[in-house]
């Protein structure tokens, strides 16, 4: 069903770890409006879609969201790699995450609340599901906030 290419859609190269920024970006991975929820939403809703074209589109979008999830995971990983104890102690935003997950990439919101399927919906009603998709995509705009409000002087990645 899926073909996996062993490369990211866009390269992620972050030279300097930044655990404070990682504490914000992690919401794009497993927060209520993050990529994990988006991919599960689309891939679940496709089964009850009565039109082949819409079913195919939901499959394509859900698969694309999995790719986005992988890029966010790479960003979080690179922002937290090789942290010293001092780095963690000096970043109160990242310290609670570190207690439970060290530098593992775990699907959670910046608040620390773990990802849950309770933040997505698949009703079986095509109109309700597509309406929910539109609302969720609007909410995903929040994910640009950490990127737009932070400078990445030692990094290169495209956020599209």
Predicted features by range, described:
Residues 1-160:
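Non-heme di-metal
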């Amino acid at each position: 069903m899926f073909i996996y290419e062993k490369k990211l859609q866009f390269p992620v190269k972050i030279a300097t770890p930044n655990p404070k920024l990682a504490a914000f970006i992690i919401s794009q991975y497993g927060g209520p409006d993050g990529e994990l929820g988006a991919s599960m939403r689309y891939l679940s809703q496709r089964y009850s879609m009565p039109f082949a074209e819409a079913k195919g589109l939901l499959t394509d979008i859900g698969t694309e969201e999995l790719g986005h999830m992988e890029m966010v995971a790479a960003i979080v990983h690179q922002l937290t790699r090789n942290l010293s104890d001092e780095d963690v102690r000096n970043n109160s935003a990242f310290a609670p995450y570190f207690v439970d997950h060290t530098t593992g990439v775990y699907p959670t919101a910046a608040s620390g609340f773990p990802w849950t399927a309770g933040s997505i919906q698949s009703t079986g009603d095509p109109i309700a599901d597509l309406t929910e998709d539109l609302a969720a995509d609007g909410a995903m705009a929040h994910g640009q906030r950490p990127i737009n409000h932070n400078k990445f002087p030692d990094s290169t990645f495209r956020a599209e």
